[in-house]
Amino acid sequence: MSNLPFLLEIGTEEIPDWMIVPALGQLRDSVQALLDGHGLQGKVSWVDATPRRLALRADGIIERQPDSKEVKKGPPIAGGQRAAEGFAKKQGIPVESLTQEGGYFVGVKMVTGRAAADILAADLARLIRKIQWPKTMYWTGGKTGPRFIRPIRWLVALLGGNVVPFEIAGVQSGAVTRGHRKLGASSVPVTVENYRDSLAASGVILAAADRRRKIETEIAGLLEGTGLKVHADADLLDTLVFITEHPTPILGGFDPQYLELPSEVLVTVMRHHQKYFSVEGADGKLAPNFIAVMNTNADPEGLVRRGNERVLRARFNDARFFWQVDQQKKLADRVADLASVTFQAKLGSYLEKT
């Protein structure tokens, strides 16, 4: 009996970055529990994801469960031969094979193992729908339709060289994935073995670790010889890894006049509003530069860079306006305004609390 590899891909609209890793953990555990529970002997080899797909591979799955014996407890011996014959007929076993134990007829039934493909086909839709998300949505069939974090657009399920057939919300599983929205094809045939390479050829870097490495390496290349260094931000890096399928960093700049604002204001605008890395000079002070990560492979004409610079300039202008307005009134002079902010209906305002 040969051992088979299994590939599952759930293709969706873009999933929020912070929800992806927990979902992958659930998917891994659910598939492994399915394999273990049915005695299929396989092990999940890896799980990985991009914003548009959750993917899993398992290896060593046997084609069919081993046949097994199931002991069935029958009617009391006092019921006689007729009871024994009825029990044997119901179980599909010869009446002469029955034994007597503890005052009851007992039969041993041979159970033919199910094909792994049939088990997977029967359970995969349930496992996918069982993934727990902080929020879910309907996208077809109204409130009677399935719920998921984002609409499911395609499904890949392959056991060895064969499709494992199942369906969710009218989407049938197959052997065709989708490439990068801009760099790849909308229809990419795959096998279990060429899955990663086929995605790569269609502009998708499947492994989160590879996307992370690409971002870090290319940022280092951008800053080499400039005397600048990126402000390390592990959380932002995690976000960028899971909002891109083909990340490419670009170095942009802004007018040094904005450095008159507190660095905390500028970094907050770049990091939280634009998902940019801030950049520091050799002296450790904020430099008039930033690093954005685009979801494509190149910006030969600088259009993406200039677009990001234009957006950041507008953000900084807004920040400067509010900073200047805030400075027109001392903090101590704002205490009286707390009278209009309720702390708790029965306890009074924040001024009274202060």
Please provide the spans of the model-predicted regions.
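Long, basic N-terminal domains or extensions that often function
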Residues: 1-266
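Catalytic nucleotidyl-transfer cores of nucleotide-processing enzymes
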Residues: 152-153, 231-352
